[in-house]
Every structure is written in structure tokens, then in C-alpha cells.
């Protein structure tokens, strides 16, 4: 995975197809996944991570090699790895959390406790 994580053919969709092709091959024993990304789309990150988890469920080892940087979604897609290798100068860290606040004004008939 090189660059910002995006959806679409040039982004996560293409990477997912490559991972799927590897884990659907019965001769595959391991997937070495190179990450050089500051992150990006949470949906794209989740798609790639899910595909790596599918490979792990098939007893395929997942090995991540981090390049110049692996942050946010780049770290998140690395979490299924059995092994993670990084360069001494790799900048890595911070899995961000998305938050969508709920609108409870429209909830009728609910009993609310006050704190």
C-alpha cells in the first residue's frame, strides 16, 4: 500500500483484489504487505484489514513491512499481522477514532437517567 488510502480502483479496491487473489491461491503460505502510507479513508482501511483477516483465517501468515511512514489507517491495516517490520526511520503510530454523534432529540418514549 503506497500513499494515501482511498477507495476505488487505484486505492483499496485494487489492493483488496491482490490480497484476495493471494489468499484464494491454495499454494500461498504467507502474504508480505508493504505499508508506506499516512492513512486516509477509514472504509478503505477497513476493507484491506478485513481481507488480511480473511487470509489469517485460512492459516496464511501475514507479514507487514513498513516504509517511510505508516500512520492512522496505515497502522490499522497492519494490526492483523503476525509480524511487523519497520525501518529505523519509519514514522508510525496513531490509529484515529471516527465519531458520529447521535441525535437523540428524535427519540420518543425513552426514559433518560440524569447524571
Residues covered by each model-derived region:
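Small-residue-centered hinge/linker elements
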Residues: 1-60, 69-115
Amino acid at each position: 500500500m503506497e500513499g494515501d488510502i482511498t477507495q476505488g480502483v487505484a486505492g483499496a479496491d485494487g489492493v483488496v483484489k491482490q490480497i484476495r487473489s493471494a489468499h484464494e491461491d491454495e499454494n500461498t503460505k504467507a502474504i508480505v504487505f508493504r505499508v508506506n502510507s499516512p492513512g486516509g479513508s477509514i472504509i478503505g482501511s477497513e476493507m484491506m484489514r478485513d481481507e488480511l483477516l480473511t487470509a489469517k483465517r485460512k492459516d496464511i501468515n501475514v507479514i507487514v513491512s513498513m516504509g517511510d511512514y505508516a500512520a492512522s489507517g496505515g497502522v490499522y491495516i497492519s494490526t492483523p499481522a503476525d509480524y511487523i517490520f519497520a525501518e529505523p526511520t519509519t514514522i508510525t503510530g496513531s490509529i484515529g477514532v471516527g465519531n458520529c454523534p447521535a441525535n437523540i432529540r428524535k427519540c420518543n418514549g425513552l426514559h433518560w437517567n440524569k447524571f
